[in-house]
Each structure stands twice: as C-alpha cells, then as structure tokens.
Amino acid sequence: MAAAAGRRMGPSWWGFSPALDLQVHCLQGTIQHLTSSDGLPELNILLVGGGDGRHLLKTICQASRWPHRKLKFFIIESDLELLARHMLFLSLALEHPEQMGLQEKSELFLELFGNSLIRSKTANYLQEKSELFIQCVTDPDYQQCVMPFLNLSSIKFKERDELEDIFKFWRIADPKLFPIDKYWDGKNRRHLGTRYDSRKGAYDWDLSMKLHDRGAGVINSREYNYWREKGVAFMNREGVYDVPNKTLASQMVVPQSSGKVLTRGYWGDITTSPYVAFGIETEEKSLLETANGVHVKSAQEIALHNIISLFHELATGKVYSVPASGQAEAELVKPVGDYKTNGDQTAAETIEEKAEAEDTKQSKYKGFITLNNVEIHFLPLSWVNELHCKGRFTNFFNLLYFSSSMVHLLKPEYKVIAASKATLVLELTKFMVDLQADKVQSYVSIVTKLAQGAGFTSDEPIDWKTHYIARFERGDDSVELQTAQ
C-alpha cells in the first residue's frame, strides 16, 4: 500500500500536503542535539521525494524567524525533471528585487508551478533561464559563481547530461513538441473511462466528497473544475494562456505494440490539484473567512498571498503585512470564466508585453539574492538505498522527510544516518483524491510500522482525518548497523 500510494505514478509536480517550514516541525529533542560548525548550530535535512520544492522554499524563506542556524538540505527525487524544477523555482524566488517585482515574481512562480499552459511572456522567461541552467550543469565553476548555494557535486555525469537535455528541451520554443492539452485530455479520458461524458459530475464529486470533506474547503468548484478540465490552476492577470509549460514534461517507459518505449508526455497528477501545496492554509486568517457558509477568497488568491509573503520575507527578513485594500494585492484572481486561454489576445496586451520585453532587454541583470548559511545538495536517486553505506552520513541527518510517493523506500538502514533524537516527518495521504477513506486510514498504520522499523517512535496520536503529516523521533535504543566507508 505504501508503495502503491505513489510508485511510478509519474513525477509529483506538486505535493499532497501543504508547504511546511521544517523548523516548525523539528522536535525539541532534535534541536537540543544539534552539533555546531563555525560556531553555528547545523541543521541537516534530508528530503526524499519533496517533489515541488515547497518545503524547501518555505523553510528557507522563513529562516529569519528562528535562532541563527546553518541549514543544509540534501534532496533526492524520483525524476531528474523534479531537480530541474527545483533549480527553476529557487532561481525565481531569488531573483533580485531590482530585476523583478514581488507581484510579478509571485505570479510567474504560480504559473510555472501549477499550469499546463502559460503565457508567451512566461515561456520567454523559461527559455532564458534554461540557458543559465545549461551552463550551470555543464560548468561547475560557473555554477558555483552564479548559484553558490547549490551543490551538484554528487550528481553523476550521466545525470548531468540528462539535466542538460531537459533544459535544452525547455529552451526550444516550438509548442508542437509538447502538446500538453492533448496529453491532459488523453489522461483524463483514461482516468474517467465511461464517466468522461459526465466528467463535470465526477469533478464535483471529487471536490466535495474528497477535498472538501478532508479539509480543503477553500478550493471552489469553478477553479477546481477548470483545472481538472484544462490543467490551468493559476491565472492572475488578463492574458492568453496557450503555450505548453515544458517543465511538466517527463519521460516514462510505456507498453506499446512494438514493446516498451520511453515516451515523453504528461504523467503527473490530474485529480488532487496544485492548490493543496500553497492554497488551502495561510497565516492571514482573514483570507479564510466565510460568508453564508461560502469562502470569500479562493485557493488561487490564498496561494498568491502566501507566495508573495514568502518571497517578501526571503528578500527582507521581515514578516509580510497585508497592505490596505486597493494597494499591492489589488490584482488578485478574477473568476475563471473571465480568463482567455486561446485566440482572443487584445491589442493592449500585445503592446504591454512588447514594452515589458524591451524593458527586460535594457535592464542590467542584478544576480540572485544572497543566501547566507544555506546549502542545497542534489543527490542521485540511487543513493536513496545507499546513504547508510556512506560514512559521511553516519548519524548525520537531524530531520528526515519522506513524501507519500517515496515512503516505501524508508528502510531499517536509515537508523544509521539519523542523528541522535532526529525527527522523521512522513507525508500522509489525506488529500490524495484517488484514495478512498479506508485506504487513507490504513496508510497511517503502514507508515507507522515503516518508521518503527527504521528506529523511530512517536508519542503523538495520528488522526488520519485531520493530519496530513506524521512526526516521529529516533529512539534511544536504535541499533547501529555496519556501514562501509
């Protein structure tokens, strides 16, 4: 069941739980047992299957809330395309304020994060960034110069070559190479089968009986149904969304009449939605208010506010305050029906985009916001079964996170790499639409056994109806296994 929850479902382009500031979820015993480097406590975090980078981003953006620590992230993903997206989202979050405004940056992030189709302006940005990433993965010295917070030294040469190919694919302007609207509809038809002709009812059922019942009531039917139909979740400005988002392309071995063939397509989620990651929780409780039992704000609006807040805090080190009505967040989401997705681009928008493109050419690139005391290490997928064999990681990780799609890889050997009193965070399947309630409930027992097998215990009761993560602590009686140096 743990494996079935996510094994080869395709890449987890967005997670099945809201973004976490991982320092919030570090148990007190973990914090008390941190070791220091250069006078700073060091928090070593292993992320296995984080997927969309939401936990990484939120933890980095909110680091100024905590006592000064050195944060070291070690990331293992199921697909190299996910590491490529990590690089994109990190570089976007760290764009210098003089290079890109807060509102524009936040809208661009959500568009690339959760949309199958993007604006031509956004596609141009992606192509430009792809050039940078190609240089980074092919020239380590250049990468350390422009993105010193990122460490790719553990990535194998073959994986570097594959990352280069991914970025080269992103760089190609031809939309015909990735007809995601066709892929999306095809996957929808296969998923729904005979229900396809009455799919609006299926969408409403999943939203009401799964997402709403499990606590994601802020997602409204209009935005959810539109995403289920088109794959477009965030449309924060008037614009034409007609360019395939190539960052959602990946390859999978698919059985065909001629045998198994490596095929590029869209292999990700079409039921849970990108809204869960950033759009169903917020510190600004006024955004969760209801009127006559209906949420006043949409998941899109909440997601935009949350991303603006995170990026503001990253740039300034200060918690974001909601501006007075009519100021900075005036350009929030309009009803989905007002959006244009093809063919009806206005002359005014064309003029605006040309002017913005010209401004971009004339502006001098300012580089990235400096990340102090943060290291991000990409690790090969094969290492998920080899970390305990590498002496450098013995008793090393203070916090370990496994997504629901990769928790089946949590083995007893992980007690070797967990530091004293380490925290283990496991994603649950509460918001996984494709699972019935009995499967969501039984999943808790399964992952608890996996955690216990790896030497972790918990005194916290886990309620499958309300919790979307489970926390465990490394037990004192954990037995060290023999490791190879």
UniProtKB/Swiss-Prot annotation:
Keywords: Cilium biogenesis/degradation, Cytoplasm. It comes from the Eukaryota. One of its GO terms (cellular component) is dynein axonemal particle. The keyword Cytoplasm applies. GO terms for biological process: axonemal dynein complex assembly; motile cilium assembly. It is found in: Cytoplasm; Dynein axonemal particle. The keyword Cytoplasm applies. Required for the assembly of axonemal inner and outer dynein arms. Involved in preassembly of dyneins into complexes before their transport into cilia. This is Dynein axonemal assembly factor 3. It comes from Xenopus laevis.
